[in-house]
C-alpha cells in the first residue's frame, strides 16, 4: 500500500498533463478515421465528502453541495473523450474555455475537424473569432438575450421541418463584435413536441 502511494505521489499535475497529452496525441494519430465532429460541454459533478478541488457553485440538482465543474470534449463520431479538464465547482462555464479549445485541437494535430459543436457556455466572441480564424465549421447554441428574442418573435419566414418544429435564420451582431454572424433559430410547439 505505501509503495503504491509513494509511487503515485511522484505524479504532479504537470507530469500528468505531459504524459497524458502525449498519450492522447499517439492514440488519435493511430485512429484511421478523419473528419471529426467535436462536441464541447461542461457538466456538474456532485461530490460527497471533501474531495480535492470540490467547491460550492452552480449545482441545479443539489444546491449547496460541493461539486466539480469539468470541461469535456468528445469525438462524437467514435464516442471517445478527446479532452477533459477537472475544475472546481465554483468555476463559471466560460472560465478557460479558449485555452481548453486550443489544447483539445492541439491533441488532434494532423486530423481534420469537420464540425465543432458547443453549448451556450462557449458562446463568446473569442471562441467565434478563434474558430473562424482556424477555418472550422461550428454550431454553437447562443444565449437567449432580448435581441435574440426580438428576432425570433418578429421573424416571418419559417421553414417547417416536421409537425411542431420550424427553423429560420437571421443576421445578428452582438455588442463588441466586428461583424455580424448568421444565426439559425429553431422553434418548437411544446404540445406537439414535448421534451
Q: Residue ranges of each PLM-predicted region?
A:
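Active-site-proximal, Lys/Arg-enriched surface segment
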Residues: 1-72
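Short, structured patches in soluble enzyme cores that scaffold and shape functional sites
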Residues: 42-44, 75, 85-88, 120, ...
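Electropositive, glycine- and tryptophan-enriched low-complexity nucleic-acid-binding patches
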Residues: 60-111
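Short, conserved catalytic/metal-binding motifs centered on acidic residues
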Residues: 1-4, 34-45, 79, 113-123, ...
Amino acid at each position: 500500500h505505501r509503495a503504491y502511494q509513494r509511487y503515485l505521489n511522484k505524479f504532479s499535475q504537470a507530469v500528468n498533463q505531459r504524459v497524458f497529452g502525449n498519450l492522447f496525441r499517439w492514440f488519435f494519430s493511430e485512429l484511421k478515421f478523419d473528419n471529426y465532429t467535436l462536441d464541447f460541454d461542461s457538466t456538474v459533478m456532485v461530490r460527497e465528502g471533501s474531495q480535492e478541488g470540490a467547491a460550492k457553485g452552480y449545482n441545479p440538482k443539489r444546491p449547496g453541495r460541493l461539486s466539480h465543474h469539468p470541461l469535456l470534449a468528445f469525438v462524437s463520431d467514435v464516442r471517445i473523450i478527446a479532452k477533459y479538464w477537472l475544475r472546481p465547482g465554483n468555476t463559471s462555464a466560460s472560465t478557460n474555455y479558449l485555452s481548453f479549445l486550443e489544447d483539445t485541437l492541439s491533441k488532434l494535430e494532423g486530423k481534420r475537424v469537420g464540425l465543432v459543436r458547443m453549448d451556450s457556455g462557449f458562446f463568446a466572441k473569442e471562441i467565434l473569432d478563434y474558430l473562424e480564424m482556424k477555418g472550422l465549421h461550428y454550431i454553437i447554441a447562443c444565449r437567449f438575450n432580448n435581441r435574440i428574442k426580438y428576432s425570433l418573435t418578429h421573424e416571418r419566414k419559417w421553414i417547417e421541418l416536421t409537425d411542431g418544429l420550424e427553423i429560420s435564420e437571421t443576421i445578428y451582431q452582438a455588442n463588441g463584435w466586428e461583424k455580424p454572424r448568421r444565426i439559425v433559430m429553431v422553434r418548437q410547439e411544446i404540445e406537439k413536441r414535448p421534451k
